[in-house]
Amino acid sequence: MVVLGVDPGSLKTGYGVVRQDSSGFSVLTCGVIRLHSGKSHAERIGQIYRELEEIINSTKPRRVALETVFLSKNAQSALKLGQVRGAVIALSMNTDLELHEYAPREVKSAVTGRGSASKEQVAFMVTRMLQVTGHITSYDVTDALGLALCDLLRIGNRAAQEPAQGISRGNKNWTGFVRAFPEMVVR
């Protein structure tokens, strides 16, 4: 299964494509779509759409994992973020991909075992789980990869008809997480 994770933003949009097969997780591609602040918002949305479409065409994901909207005190920022999300949703529908949305707390819980984890903790666990180091220096990328991982972990949980210990919403302790991912333990 291949999933495209998207961390939307009006100036930087993170993306990460993760494959899960019998040998585990692997990153097919990841990065940040950097948008020039001098361009109109409509031009930036068009750029996001086109660049993500190229990524979809080259990596062939079956699903898109998108971060849900968070409440913002700045209405203008929230509207712009909503428009970026709309472009990603439209692209998902136009390319016949399943779209799944996850709240930041749900992603944090799936990847670290704690819904209140910091960005640093999420980045650490994402790079460990995907066995990538060094070249990922942006939280936009680790957040997008975390979204893809969250989706893949949720698929696995649904397929097994019972949540894996330490990953489900109900079990937020490290013991359950270590049982679910023994290969992550450094001895």
Swiss-Prot record:
Reactions catalysed according to its record: Endonucleolytic cleavage at a junction such as a reciprocal single-stranded crossover between two homologous DNA duplexes (Holliday junction)
Location of the active site: 7, 67, 140
Transmembrane segments: none
CDD domains membership: RuvC
Pfam families found in the cross-reference section: RuvC (PF02075)
Subunit structure: Homodimer which binds Holliday junction (HJ) DNA. The HJ becomes 2-fold symmetrical on binding to RuvC with unstacked arms; it has a different conformation from HJ DNA in complex with RuvA. In the full resolvosome a probable DNA-RuvA(4)-RuvB(12)-RuvC(2) complex forms which resolves the HJ.
NCBIfam families in the record: ruvC
Protein name listed in UniProt: Crossover junction endodeoxyribonuclease RuvC
Organism: Chlorobium phaeobacteroides (strain DSM 266 / SMG 266 / 2430)
